[in-house]
Amino acid sequence: MKRTFILMLDSFGVGAATDADKFGDVGSDTFGHIAQACADGKADIGRQGPLKLPNLARFGLGHAGFESTGKFAAGFADNVEVIGAYGHADELSSGKDTPSGHWEMAGVPVLYEWGYFSDLTNSFPKELTDKILERAGLDGFLGNCHASGTQILEELGEEHMKTGKPIFYTSADSVFQIACHEESFGVENLYNLCKIAREELEPYNIGRVIARPFVGTGPADFARTGNRHDYAVLPPAPTVLDKLKDAGGEVVSIGKISDIYAHSGITQQFKATGLEELFDETLAQIKRAGDNTIVFTNFVDFDSHYGHRRDTAGYAKALEYFDSRLPELLAILQPEDLVIFTADHGCDPTWVGTEHTRERVPVLAYGAGLSAGSLGRRKSFADIGQSIASYFKLEPMNYGESFIN
């Protein structure tokens, strides 16, 4: 019975990519810098001491970090008995965004340039926002700038609730984000507004429209909820998910995976919010999974709650929680199963700003007859998709080199 389980630690990079200089990210290292902060006693909020990831270390995380950066992360060493195949991958895609990373790991790199709203203020063309407002029956909007999601709620959340005007904002990624209060504006109204924006953004080649619902009564308690929804464009070619689905297999999405692939190649989707729920649902779906099945989970909190917010201690605590659940995963695996731990980009919580970092990602693979040891540096995330295609004996992808015979 052939089954593949992809646990995608959103933003968990393992050192600056070969082309990091093009992005201003030379020296970034999400894993290494978190480990160093922990070792230095600078990440003791809610946790204490060195970064403890014994199970990921057994899958080869420390060794992957060493091969990527030339040194072991603080607290990790060569004295661990590694049970998995480990490597690290550079990104071929033009951007360091979520869709690019996900699509590339499924065998379809983004080799064109996304559209961006690069102006920090007055970010959106008036022609665009006028069309969105007219179609939605709204008389105005707030924001129109680059901002972090938490910051803009503190600044504009109350005005939004008083006026009913949605908050439009963007970032260094190819995104158009809309924040609205779940009660005063309504979640369905927000989703409908995002669908309108998605249609009007087609000429601008923007990767995603993101609905950012929030709750609360004021800046002190405004909080984004788990009802986020991403409206992505379709990948430019069939991914390995599409190929397995077309071959009669099952592709189970947990978390925001389905949104990122614009629901293409997905046969079942399950919503879950927070690391605990996401891991619980992953285990539940693995127990249910039959032959020719992919279960694919995005653990978004690493990125959204800790990476972008530059919360090093929070990121470390979340990693340690994730690691603590891995024995439960190992206990339910079957001999032919293939498990892959990876990431879609970096988001170094010690780095300047609030954006993603251009980093290599870990490629930790276990099962399916793979020998423990190094997979080396992979030239593209697409090696993951190609390996999955090889594992399921699907038609090869156009990009990537399989590490599975």
Curated annotation (Swiss-Prot):
Its cofactor is Mn(2+). Pathway: Carbohydrate degradation; 2-deoxy-D-ribose 1-phosphate degradation; D-glyceraldehyde 3-phosphate and acetaldehyde from 2-deoxy-alpha-D-ribose 1-phosphate: step 1/2. CDD domains: PPM. SUPFAM superfamilies: Alkaline phosphatase-like, DeoB insert domain-like. The keyword Cytoplasm applies. Keywords: Cytoplasm, Isomerase, Manganese, Metal-binding. Its EC number is 5.4.2.7. The keyword Cytoplasm applies. GO terms for cellular component: cytosol. Binds 2 manganese ions. One of its GO terms (molecular function) is manganese ion binding. Belongs to the phosphopentomutase family. NCBIfam families: deoB, PRK05362.1. This is Phosphopentomutase.
